[in-house]
Swiss-Prot record:
Binds 2 [4Fe-4S] clusters per subunit. It comes from Yersinia pseudotuberculosis serotype O:1b (strain IP 31758). SUPFAM superfamilies: alpha-helical ferredoxin, Nqo1 FMN-binding domain-like. PROSITE patterns: 4FE4S_FER_1, 4FE4S_FER_2. Gene3D superfamilies: 3.30.70.20, NADH-ubiquinone oxidoreductase 51kDa subunit. The keyword Cell inner membrane applies. The gene is rnfC. This is Ion-translocating oxidoreductase complex subunit C. Part of a membrane-bound complex that couples electron transfer with translocation of ions across the membrane. [4Fe-4S] cluster 2 binds at residues 387, 416, 419, 422. The lineage of its organism: Bacteria, Pseudomonadati, Pseudomonadota, Gammaproteobacteria, Enterobacterales. [4Fe-4S] cluster 1 binds at residues 377, 380, 383, 426. It is a peripheral membrane protein.
Amino acid sequence: MFKLFTARQHDKIWDFDGGIHPPEMKLQSSTVPMRIAPLPDQLIIPLQQHLGPEGELRVRAGEQVLKGQPLTVGRGRTVPVHAPTSGMITAIAPHTTAHPSGLAELCVHITPDGEDRWREQQPWADYRQRDKMALLDRIHQAGIAGLGGAGFPTASKLQGGLNGIITLIINAAECEPYITADDRLMQEHADEVITGIHILRHLLQPQQVLIGIEDNKPEAIAALQRALRGQDDIHLRVVPTKYPSGGAKQLTKILTGKEVPFGKHSSSIGVLMQNVGTVVAIKRAVIDDEPLIERVVTLTGDALSSPGNFWARIGTPVLYLLKLAGFKPQNPPMVIMGGPLMGFTLPSLDVPIVKISNCILAPAETEMGLSEPEQSCIRCGLCVDACPAGLLPQQLYWFSRGEEHEKARNHNLFDCIECGACAYVCPSNIPLVQYYRQEKAEIRALDQESARAAEAKARFEAKQARLAREKLARELRHKQAAVKLTDADQQTVDAAVSRLTRQSDGSESVINIPAGQMPDNSAVIAAREARKAQARARQAEKQQARSTEETTDVVDPRQAAVAAAIARVKAKKAAQVQHVTTDVAEAGSEAIAEDPRKAAVAAAIARVKAKKAAQAQHVTTDVAEAGSEAMAEDPRKAAVAAAIARVKAKKAAQAQHVTTDVAEAGSEAIAEDPRKAAVAAAIARVKAKKAAQAINPD
């Protein structure tokens, strides 16, 4: 059949392995003109509607926005989203989105004001006057992502293909059953499709541009042919209907005969592909300055009384659109986002339309058939024959069930396009695509965890290396600080080193003691005796020097006179002390004989007088010695010193007399005890005698 089809074609096309021919079910909606869905009461715009991270919010709750105003911003693979209409942001909160998991994502809730007022627009009538980077930035700021289902950021994809693209392919196959959004778009907006192709051709400068469309769309083919009239640089290729001929790798093989290697993209062989809906969005963004805020959505299925295609604003709830198409709820309820083979059942009808939502399928109870239970694999091999990617679905199924992630990866699991052909032909009703999706998610989660661990390890190693460098730097600084010496310090150090060297040269040799023998200490003993002899000699020299000085002092007449004066003073003081002592003794003996109390008083007075006499004698001696030194130097000074000595001696005698009077006055307080008085008197006599001897030892 394929050979008969290609025989009638002027341009050569190829075929791909595998594929199936399910019922098309397209006539329910392809023959009905498109309608414009009115604005709902509330729009729910998810921040992430593409393959990449979500953008940074630029609005807040309670703020008024205009139609086309950016809600988020971003660069690279972060595609911004825009306000589909003018109104107020009532909330920024999580909401369930169109995803198989049914998880909630952050969304902007907008209540339309009914005015639908645009932000300021700046159309580009002649895009050829703009450079390529300006065009790419315009496409990026418009928030355009692939509308065929993948949602890859269009600007990033085009920027990667600025160099080396040979063939530009426009994907108009739309091969999955029930879906007719691209079909109706080409029928009613063929001119915009061709204008968008020219913009891409201006950007990429490919050698050839091909439009691939299946032969089950005669009205769309005719509309494109009319729009291409007189243009020979764009070629329309009609291909036989076969699922999934709309896959990127499969359509590339059909139109060019080239196969994309495992793990690679079509750009690796010089091919870049864009969907028809994406091309129209590019045209409106570049020329009309309209961001991607609406798209064509197919509403079909036997549960709808008026199926068709609608221009729906991004963020419109699914239930609102279903009501526009005459939705009749089924039991059990089933609404599918996407087609019957690649779509998924919605967890809630309150989820919003997003940029990659091309179809909402609401089948009746009997339309999809009864759901039969899953059975064991019988290894029939039908899934292998149907796989358009040349994989081994049976092996991938076992690896996914057994959580053998590396084996699944090595068997090219990520080359699976999840077309559902294997599950369609499986006689055991095994939902193979669900297993593959789950396995891909688990592998991605493990890869992310490994990447985080590697990043943490790299940070730790970098920290350790930094600490080691800082430690080495500190040690180097310490060494440099310790070594830094001034010239004077260096000279001092050198001098000390030289002294130590000389001392070590003159020092005694080290004594070695053989094992088992007693040490010979004779040398040490001799050295010690020599040091003692030297000490005795130095002591004798000092004594001789002192005696010589005394002899010299006596020979000198002036010093002799001073010495004689000192001797007379000492003799006089000794006589006085002796007289005082005798009087004290006599008074004490008389007091003892007469009254014990008086004896105690006398003893106390004697002690005080003896002490004062000794102090006076010491002062007089010091003064005399000082005067002798002065006299030895000068006779006039000697006379002055003698006068000063006489005055000091007189004052000392007066102080002694006062002290004696005080002692006599206090003697009345002595306790009345004969024995204690006798003892005190005896002690006083002894102390007085000792004081006299100390004053005059001669």
